[in-house]
């Protein structure tokens, strides 16, 4: 077989696969709120409508990172969690290794090629909250999530937040029936083109 006949892959595709080191469960909670999710790949996107808890999740992690002993927020994870934001994102990112990095929407740098290049050279996992398309980043549609809430607001019960896939992984399979295939082979068009 000719070497040129094999499909080629972009380095960004390899980054998505090569740095997948396993699953990481993350639990972020207070007495009233709880987020529990599992990261399967190094890049996870959270999308959804306003008031679904996306920014609250990032705020809770920021509170924990900035003041771990003085906050009611508890973060349970096998990796350290960080929040990267603002105009100093490059400097923040350069000091983070083998961690889970959360980035909230409104940070314009997430849409840049510079950001995409930088994160592909790291060993971090990234959770990005955004409503925008991120064409420079190689992420899987299987890792785009929304946040669903169970429990009631306005009560003393803990509200439990879980991630759900926005794009399903179900595939549609339809077998070709032999009579359709046979009739197509006998059509005048097929006979002329044969």
Question: Which residues does each PLM region occupy?
Answer:
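Post-Walker A alpha-helix
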Residues: 57-59
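A short helix-turn-beta junction within AAA+ P-loop NTPase domains corresponding to the substrate/partner-engaging
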Residues: 139-164
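Conserved lysine of the Walker
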Residues: 54
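N-terminal pre-Walker A segment at the start of P-loop NTPase domains
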Residues: 15-35, 155-170
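Short, small-residue-biased leader/transition segments that mark boundaries at the very start
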Residues: 4-11, 181-186, 193
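Conserved P-loop NTPase "ATPase switch" module shared by AAA+ and STAND
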Residues: 89-113
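Sensor-1/coupling segment of RecA-like P-loop NTPase cores
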Residues: 119-148
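The conserved Walker
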Residues: 50
């Amino acid at each position: 077989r000719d070497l040129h006949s094999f499909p080629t892959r972009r380095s960004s595709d390899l980054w998505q696969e090569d740095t997948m080191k396993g699953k990481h469960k993350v639990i972020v909670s207070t007495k009233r709120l709880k987020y529990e999710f599992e990261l399967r790949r190094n890049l996870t996107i959270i999308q959804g409508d306003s008031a679904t808890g996306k920014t609250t999740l990032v705020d809770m992690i920021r509170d924990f990172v900035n003041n771990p002993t003085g906050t009611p927020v508890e973060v349970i994870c096998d990796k350290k969690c960080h929040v990267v934001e603002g105009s100093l994102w490059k400097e923040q990112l350069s000091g983070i290794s083998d961690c889970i990095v959360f980035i909230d929407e409104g940070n314009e740098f997430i849409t840049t090629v510079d950001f995409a290049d930088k994160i592909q050279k790291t060993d971090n996992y990234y959770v990005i909250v955004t409503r925008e398309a991120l064409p420079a980043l190689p992420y899987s549609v299987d890792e785009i999530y929304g946040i669903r809430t169970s429990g009631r607001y306005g009560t003393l019960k803990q509200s439990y937040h879980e991630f759900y896939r926005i794009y399903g992984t179900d595939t549609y399979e339809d077998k070709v029936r032999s009579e359709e295939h046979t009739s197509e082979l006998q059509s005048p068009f097929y006979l002329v083109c044969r």
